[in-house]
Amino acid sequence: MRMLVLKPPFIFEITIIEPHPIGQDMEWTRSGEDLFVRIDSGDEIHASLQRLADEVGFNAAAITSGIGRTRDTLYGYMNEDGVYIRRQLDSPSELVSLSGNIARKQDGTAFTHIHCCWSDDDNNVHAGHMFQCVVHVVAEIHIRILKHAIMTRCPLPDVELLGLQFS
C-alpha cells in the first residue's frame, strides 16, 4: 500500500507500508521502527512475538500496547520471596491492556516480558505478569523497535525473574 504523507511546507513524501505474513496466522506491518502486529485465533502471544523478533531481526523493543480477545491465560505476580504466584483464567476474556518489552537472553533467543489486564464476561478485571495467553479471536499489538539499544535477560539470584541488563 502506498500512502501519501503531507508535511509542512507540503513537501510530498511517499511511505511504502506493506503487510508481512509470518507463521500461519500472524501478519505485521512496519513504518520506520514501529510494527503493528495482528495475531489470530489459536496462536500463543509470547511465541508469536518471539518469532516476530527473529523474523524481523531486532534485539530490543518496547511493546507499547495491545488489545484483543484471549483464552487459556496463565498470569500472576511475584510475591515478597521472589516466587511467582500463578493464576489460571480459562474462559475467553477481553485483553484490555498489554505492555512490556522484547530482549534477548544470553544464548541469543528472544525473550518477551509482558504484563496485561483482562476483563472477563462479568467485567471483573484480572491483571499481572503474563506467562501464557492464547488468542481467542484476535490480538492487535504495537511494538517500537529500539534499534540502538542492547538489552539482555540474565538470571537474578534468589528470584524466578530474568533481570534486564543494558550493555
Model-derived features: positions:
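Leucine-biased recognition of intrinsically disordered, low-complexity hydrophobic segments
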Residues: L4-L6
